[in-house]
A protein has these predicted regions:
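Short intrinsically disordered, low-complexity segments
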Residues: 9-12, 36-38, 309-312
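Compositionally biased, low-complexity segments
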Residues: 18, 30, 306-307
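Bacterial N-terminal signal peptides
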Residues: 30-42
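Intrinsic disorder/low-complexity segments in short proteins, especially the signal peptide
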Residues: 8, 20-24, 41-42, 301, ...
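N-terminal secretory signal peptides that target proteins for export/translocation
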Residues: 1-27
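Eukaryotic helix-grip
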Residues: 47-312
Length: 312
């Protein structure tokens, strides 16, 4: 089945679309304060998303979706875990595997940087329905993913496709970056025991003075450049007494100033891996706690939404 055949598939939804300092010390100080793209640069380090950066991002996402298409072909590995036998064994022992999709996990594009990582784990003693139900509890993300996600709302759903919003923050040393965004999620059933899906951002904005009377959302494509776009591909397969879950997480950010790659790139890689391991650990715990949440509506109109989603 061609993923792009569906009228609401991301193929039809995603639109195509220096840091320069005269003194080396100023450039180093500006980017050091932003702590390697993660801390969020100050106003003097503001970045703006350029058309050529967005075009490169869209091309990259098209390639990622083509790779997903190939995984659906007969004789191909649906799961990244199955490409090497040791991977499945390791996750069954409880490990959460994180690896760059290509090379270092970073691809330089004009005036930007694409980060592409895959994370995989085994959720024991559960079913694909329970995992799928849990990942669809968008209103509960503020509870699942504390302290990173501080607000989460389900905006709409028709079962297979949902819209939701998140406000999340990242703290490092003395700087906090707050991002507010809207997202769409679209899932398909591959078989009775396997599914896959896509989540992509439709709006991401930097938030200044979060929670204060002077709070301000900067226009999309401006601000810190910490995150401009997000896209993910997830795969689920039930077997061996549990569910294998993997996620390819792709992000677009501002680029690294010339001469600072040696300082920035290793830290960005470590933070990327750490964030994905934490995310999957929290997801696994949310699946485990599903029986305790059964019948509760504390996260919004969960019951009707999840019945519709799991029936697709």
């Amino acid at each position: 089945m061609d993923l792009r055949a569906h009228p609401t598939h991301p193929d039809r939804r995603i639109q195509l679309g220096r840091l320069q300092r005269s003194e080396h010390g100023q450039r180093r100080h500006c980017f050091a304060i932003s702590l390697l793209l993660i801390l969020g640069p100050g106003l003097s380090c503001a970045a703006e998303l350029q058309p050529e950066t967005l075009a490169a991002w869209n091309h990259y996402i098209e390639q990622a979706k083509m790779r997903m298409n190939l995984r659906l072909d007969a004789g191909s590995h649906f799961l990244w875990l199955d490409e090497e036998s040791d991977r499945a064994r390791r996750v069954r022992r409880g490990e959460i595997l994180v690896a760059p999709v290509n090379g270092s996990g970073r691809t330089e594009v004009p005036n930007g940087l694409i980060h592409d990582w895959i994370v995989a784990a085994f959720f024991p003693d559960t079913t694909i329905e329970k995992v799928f139900v849990t990942t669809g509890e968008y209103a509960c993300y503020k509870d699942f993913y504390k302290p990173t996600v501080v607000e989460s709302k389900l905006l709409s759903t028709d079962g297979s496709e949902s819209s939701f919003s998140l406000r999340w923050l990242k703290k490092a040393l003395f700087v906090t970056t707050v991002m507010d965004g809207d997202y769409k999620a679209y899932y398909l059933r591959r078989s009775e025991k396997s599914r896959y899906g896509f989540v992509w951002s439709t709006r991401i904005q930097d938030v200044v003075n979060d929670g204060q009377s002077s709070e301000l959302k900067l226009p999309p494509g401006t601000g810190s450049g910490f995150i401009w776009r997000l896209f993910s591909i997830s795969r689920f397969e039930e077997r061996d007494g549990g569910v294998y879950v993997e996620l390819e997480a792709i992000a677009l950010s501002r680029g690294v100033p010339p001469g600072l790659g040696w300082l920035v790139n290793p830290v960005v890689s470590r933070l990327s891996q750490s964030s994905l391991v934490t995310f999957f650990s929290q997801t696994r715990e949310a699946v485990r706690s599903l029986p305790q949440r059964a019948g509760l509506d504390s996260c919004g109109s969960r019951s009707s939404v999840l019945r519709a989603r799991s029936s697709k």
